Amino acid sequence: MALRVAAFDLDGVLALPSIAGAFRRSEEALALPRDFLLGAYQTEFPEGPTEQLMKGKITFSQWVPLMDESYRKSSKACGANLPENFSISQIFSQAMAARSINRPMLQAAIALKKKGFTTCIVTNNWLDDGDKRDSLAQMMCELSQHFDFLIESCQVGMIKPEPQIYNFLLDTLKAKPNEVVFLDDFGSNLKPARDMGMVTILVHNTASALRELEKVTGTQFPEAPLPVPCNPNDVSHGYVTVKPGIRLHFVEMGSGPALCLCHGFPESWFSWRYQIPALAQAGFRVLAIDMKGYGDSSSPPEIEEYAMELLCKEMVTFLDKLGIPQAVFIGHDWAGVMVWNMALFYPERVRAVASLNTPFMPPDPDVSPMKVIRSIPVFNYQLYFQEPGVAEAELEKNMSRTFKSFFRASDETGFIAVHKATEIGGILVNTPEDPNLSKITTEEEIEFYIQQFKKTGFRGPLNWYRNTERNWKWSCKGLGRKILVPALMVTAEKDIVLRPEMSKNMEKWIPFLKRGHIEDCGHWTQIEKPTEVNQILIKWLQTEVQNPSVTSKI
């Protein structure tokens, strides 16, 4: 019978370095006999403090004094010199602080789940009421969203290597032993599983364990996997009414300083799918917004509803209704324009601002922006978008064709006619009726965009382009101002519309600007180079938001 269930231990498999390793290092550091700490910890079974802890009969704070006393008795019995101030809680605190998720192992579990495997964590764990309990909480919070089941000994009252917990695993997952592969870093925990008929893998080295897991499951794990994206069905959705009849939809994850992710055209909150979990795990309350006109947000037909002044006012109301005094704003494409304007017109509400691809360009009060657009060939598509109903008809006719034509990697054949849309009568005129799928998307992701745009059509999204003169007049009110909030500009080497050189004079208006640059990347930055985007954003956020300089920028 083929394998269809993958069960993973936590400590030493999904989390490294292991607590057992911490015991070993502490034995060496304290000049204690080998196995003095680890041996007593393990041989307290049965019915000792550790078994009671792992079965949830006592909590961590109750366990510590019992183990401290046990170690003191053991030290006298064997003549070991235990420090006077010794406490097992210190060793655990250090071990938990040092422990982090074993990313290659997690990615393997995710790959197996994508392939159709049921995945499960089976761990001897404890009820942590200690003062360092947040580290365990954070780890379990992140891991649990990627597995179908979580079996913790302290919650079910059974521990490895007792056979009962393996039977509980099979009953819970409705699986037969020969359908299960089980990974653990202790051979004693694997033996009962193997005796029952499960395939077992002893994890002493992640790389070799993964090679064995590939072999037994017939799955090739990617060498450089993408960040873990969020699933629309597994995230929290919210709505804020910003004025009568108009609401904004958002997806929320994490806790900490508020961070608003704002997408461009023709996209969705879903375009931030690779960033949402990573930023939440980095310590932020992430709110990925469906911009006005998109998805589950309201999509009024009137052009003036999409004027930049109104969009920014509604974003302030969005914060007000959620009780958020300040937020970090990160925008891409059209939303890049919006977040720069938020920093310019509502600096007191902007904790920091970042833009992907879209530079800050102050208006020229003497030159009409439409004249500028007409003078730049690559902006020709924006002229095509001006007449209501025309582009809508083209883009809505076959939305699979539309999104597969738009979402292309920088090294793939480009289809949309940004340079000559008005001349040839459309942006998709030379596009295949059934374009091949880009390597930066999946069929399921394209289908999600299609379903979102079936709700609203393209009228609202295109209206963002139809307020050029109105936006220009409003933005001229900010002439002479500088952006002094923490700011980041991320350029993409191969974006043919928002070219990196367009940002070269930004320091004149944003004197404390930080920069990031991504090579071999086109316009769809968040999905083409998600790892690089996440690294740049998190590094900047940690410096400018979580640990900001106290130096005044005024």
UniProtKB/Swiss-Prot annotation:
Domain notes: The N-terminal domain has phosphatase activity. The C-terminal domain has epoxide hydrolase activity.
Binding site for phosphate: T123, N124
Entry GO CC: cytosol; peroxisome
Enzyme class, spelled out: hydrolase
Full protein name: Bifunctional epoxide hydrolase 2
Keywords of the record: Acetylation, Aromatic hydrocarbons catabolism, Cytoplasm, Detoxification, Hydrolase, Lipid metabolism, Lipoprotein, Magnesium, Metal-binding, Multifunctional enzyme, Peroxisome, Phosphoprotein
NCBIfam families named in the record: HAD-SF-IA-v3
Summary of the knockout phenotype: In knockout mice, hepoxilin turnover to trioxilins is greatly abolished. In livers, the activity toward HxA3 (8-hydroxy-(11S,12S)-epoxy-(5Z,9E,14Z)-eicosatrienoate) and HxB3 (10-hydroxy-(11S,12S)-epoxy- (5Z,8Z,14Z)-eicosatrienoate) is greatly reduced compared with the WT mice.
CDD domains the record matches: HAD_sEH-N_like
Post-translation changes: The N-terminus is blocked. The covalent modification of cysteine by 15-deoxy-Delta12,14-prostaglandin-J2 is autocatalytic and reversible. It may occur as an alternative to other cysteine modifications, such as S-nitrosylation and S-palmitoylation.
